[in-house]
Amino acid sequence: MKALYRVLLLLAISLSVFSGCVTLRPATVDRKKDLSMFSRVYIPPTQTIHGSTAIVVSGMVLPYSQSVNPRDVIAGVLSKKGYIILNELDDRFRHETVIVNYGESNRRNFVLGYTIEVTLQFISASTGELVCTTTAEGCGSTEAADVKQAVTRALKALFK
């Protein structure tokens, strides 16, 4: 009987380690206006996020680090969707420009780690009105991976 408990305990630990993450909450989108009215995007600078972990290979522990700048992820996805990314706000294009603000809005802890929730806010450059917001969680091997996954999920939900 003692052996059965050990096997069940080992199985439970293995499953929790290999699953690595909790089920992520669905991404949400709140649309106030049509985003297709805009063709240009200005994304204010964001700070690079660094994350590190360790990987065990053949009994050796190897450090692994990763960094991501949320602005780069947002710009990559939006440029792929056909938006023109501006390095600065230009008065000539204000009526067709949307400003995208990034923010970490929550952190949810669970047994083996946490998720990071990000919110992206789309604001009209000409009127200052809120066009839409999108929020999503991310959970990866590092904080940088969490943020990258969350931003990607939020934008994917927006363009669904």
Positions of predicted regions on the chain:
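Sec-dependent bacterial lipoprotein signal peptides
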Residues: 1-21
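A structural "domain/chain start" motif
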Residues: 19-81
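Structured loop/turn residues at beta-strand edges in well-structured enzyme cores
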Residues: 16, 36, 94-95
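C-terminal alpha-helix
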Residues: 153-160
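Residues embedded in well-ordered secondary-structure elements
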Residues: 10, 32, 109-111
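Surface-exposed short loop/turn segments
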Residues: 26-27, 72-145, 149-152
